[in-house]
């Protein structure tokens, strides 16, 4: 598929009619190998809102003689922020069965992947995707899921108070998993790293696009902490 496909939408949506017809026209000739994109290749720190749409796109590929479905992720970057881990989980399930219910997959992931911190991480995720859905549905082309898009990297799209609130959810999630330290079996470390990973997106936005709101000493300290955690 084209890198200009709007992956925040499904192939059933009118905005992707050209790509939809392209796949449909190929399928009579044999097995179709689908290559979709689920990242913003300009900047891995900024989310690409394909979570729900990818489920329908897997189903579309399946009914159009799809034999192999590949979702492009982050090259040689196994641990990435913006809930990329959830995308990997969705792909792993949908590769097996395209009929899985999205809501069930979402619940299973957030109930387990972040341990007791999952409640706050789900809150972060819900606010993030709802905001991006709103921006997309308001007709803002910068949020339509095109894989090559540098236009979402501005302070106006990511207000500092929103970024601080999302980062605070991660802090609250980290507090929730403190009790697992007593297990002394690596559980705490695994959960800690998974939650810390999701702080990178809001912290990156704050450090890069809201730096003027802090003193030179403050922003230098914040950037060093960000660097140390990546």
Residue spans of the language-model regions?
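Structured mid-domain segments that build the active-site/substrate or prosthetic-cofactor binding neighborhood
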Residues: 6-123, 127-130
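Active-site lining segments of carbohydrate-active enzymes
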Residues: 2, 6-9, 14, 144, ...
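Catalytic domains of carbohydrate-active enzymes that cleave complex glycans
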Residues: 64-65, 90-230
């Amino acid at each position: 598929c084209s890198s200009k496909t709007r992956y925040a939408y499904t192939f059933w949506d009118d905005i992707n009619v050209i790509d939809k017809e392209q796949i449909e026209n190929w399928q009579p000739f044999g097995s179709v190998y689908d290559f979709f994109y689920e990242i913003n290749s300009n900047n891995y720190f900024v989310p690409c809102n394909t979570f729900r749409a990818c489920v329908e796109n897997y189903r579309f590929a399946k009914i159009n003689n799809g034999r192999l479905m590949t979702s492009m992720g982050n090259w040689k970057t196994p641990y990435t922020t913006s809930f990329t881990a959830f995308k990997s989980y969705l792909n792993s399930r949908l590769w097996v069965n395209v009929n899985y219910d999205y809501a069930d997959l979402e619940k299973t992931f957030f109930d387990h992947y972040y341990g007791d911190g999952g409640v706050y991480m789900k809150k972060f995720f819900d606010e993030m995707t709802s905001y991006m859905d709103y921006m997309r549905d308001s007709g803002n082309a910068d949020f339509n899921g095109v894989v090559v898009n540098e236009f979402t990297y501005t302070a106006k799209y990511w207000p500092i108070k929103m970024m601080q609130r999302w980062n605070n959810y991660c802090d609250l999630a980290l507090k929730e998993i403190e009790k697992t330290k007593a297990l002394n079996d690596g559980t705490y470390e695994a959960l800690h790293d998974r939650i810390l990973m999701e702080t990178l997106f809001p912290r990156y936005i704050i450090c890069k696009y809201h730096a003027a709101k802090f003193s030179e000493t403050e922003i230098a300290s914040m950037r060093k902490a960000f660097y140390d955690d990546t």
